[in-house]
Amino acid sequence: MILHICGAADWAEVGEGGEYRPLSLDDVGFIHCSDFGTAHLPADALYRGRTDLVLLEIDPGKVGVPVRWEDGEPPHPAGVRFPHVYGPLPHSAVVGVHEFGEVDGGGFRLPSALAHR
């Protein structure tokens, strides 16, 4: 499984049978994703203070477009690579939607439903 962070309202606009097309798809040609061990990295860097986020749990075998593991932008100092989805994300590829917010003391952590995967 791979994960994607987005606004709850953005995901709600994607009806069943629809496709999620964030701005990054037009801007850079792919949808930024993470895995269970790295979702906190982009969240901490880009989404501090946001209270409207969800974490999409995606089955990469159901996306129907290439998924490539590549360097982030900028590249992570430890060489961490991230999954990038090269096309729109079908609603049917999302197997879970989880509220995602900062924990007390700051920073993001996986929701408890995902923490032990």
Residues of each region from the PLM?
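Conserved, structured core segments of small domains
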Residues: M1-R117
